Amino acid sequence: MTEAPTQKKARQGRWTLFALIAVTIAPVLASYLAYYVWKPSGGKTYGELLAVQPVPAFKLATLDGQPASLAELKGKWLLVMSDSGACAQSCLDTLHALRQFRVAQGKEMDRVERLWLLTDATQPSAAALQQADGAKLLRAQEAIPLPASQADSFYLIDPLGNQVMRYPRSAEPGKVIKELTRLLKNNENIG
C-alpha cells in the first residue's frame, strides 16, 4: 500500500518536469517558427527595393554645358530616368508617367522632383522637352552609377541622396502612385 502513493507522486513529478520543459522550450520553438516559417504578409513593395546606399558622385552637366551634381537636388525625392536625347516612344511614355506620378501627389508634389539624365550629346526633341516640362535635364558625362538595367527602368532616390527603389518603365501607374504616396506620408521628416 505504501507503493501506490509513491508511484502517484513519481507520476505527478514527471508531469511537472515535462510541463517545465515544455514551458522552457515553447518560446524558443515559437520564435523559430515565427522567423523561418510564418512570413508576415505586410511590407510588400511594387518596385524593386534596392540596397539603400548613396548614389556615387558622377560628372553631370546642364544642357548648356555647365557643371552640375545630384547634390543640388538633395532634400527632394527624385524620380530618375536615363535615356538618349533622341527619346523614342518608350522614353516619351516614361517622361509622361513620371510627370503623372508627381502630379498625383497633390499638395505633396513639391517634395518630388523629376530628373532626366541624358546619356548622349543628342539634343532632345520638342516633343520630349514638352513631356519633360518641369523636369531637371542633366547630361551624364560618364557612366551612370545606378544598378544594371537602367535602360528599361526608372529610379527613386530619397532626399538624402540614397537609391531606394527601381521600377520597370512598364510599371502600373496606380501601384507606383500608391507606393510613392505611402513613402511620402511615412517619411515626412526627410523631404
Where are the predicted features?
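N-terminal Lys/Arg-rich, disordered targeting/topogenic segments
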Residues: 1-11
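Hydrophobic membrane-insertion alpha-helices, especially the h-region
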Residues: 14-35
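N-terminal "domain-start" segment that seeds a small globular fold
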Residues: 22, 29, 38-71
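Extracytoplasmic
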Residues: 55, 73-76, 109-111, 149
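Short active-site neighborhood of thiol/selenol oxidoreductases, capturing the structured segment around
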Residues: 71-92, 98
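Conserved helix-turn-beta segment immediately C-terminal to the redox Cys motif
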Residues: 95-115
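Short, internal strand/loop/helix patches
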Residues: 112-160
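Thiol-/selenol-based redox modules, centered on thioredoxin-like
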Residues: 144, 159-191
